[in-house]
């Protein structure tokens, strides 16, 4: 599928924006980059003092997975094991942040 043919859903975009803002507020910092392709990315989690370029700790998930995790944070492990969460780096396990942010 060509990138040009993929369009953002406005309702999903608004929901993702609100969820990312909540995560950023709950876990301020710039040690982890959380990417939601087509919709946005934030840097969050205090820790390693990262200043330029891409952080060593990265998480990439779809908008649908982000919404699922906000509704049920306990899904982190199973979604990661099924490959729906791509995470790298020592600080990339955001399961606790989702659990605390979206109780």
What are these model-predicted stretches?
Residues 1-103:
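Feature captures hydrophobic
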């Amino acid at each position: 599928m060509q990138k040009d043919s993929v369009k953002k859903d406005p309702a999903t975009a608004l929901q993702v924006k609100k969820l990312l803002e909540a995560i950023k507020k709950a876990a301020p910092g710039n040690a982890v980059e959380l990417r939601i392709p087509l919709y946005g990315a934030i840097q969050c989690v205090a820790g390693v003092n990262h200043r330029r370029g891409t952080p060593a700790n990265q998480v990439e998930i779809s908008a649908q997975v982000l919404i699922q995790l906000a509704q049920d944070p306990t899904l982190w492990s199973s979604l990661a094991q099924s490959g729906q969460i791509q995470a790298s780096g020592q600080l990339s396990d955001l399961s606790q942040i989702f659990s605390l942010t979206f109780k």
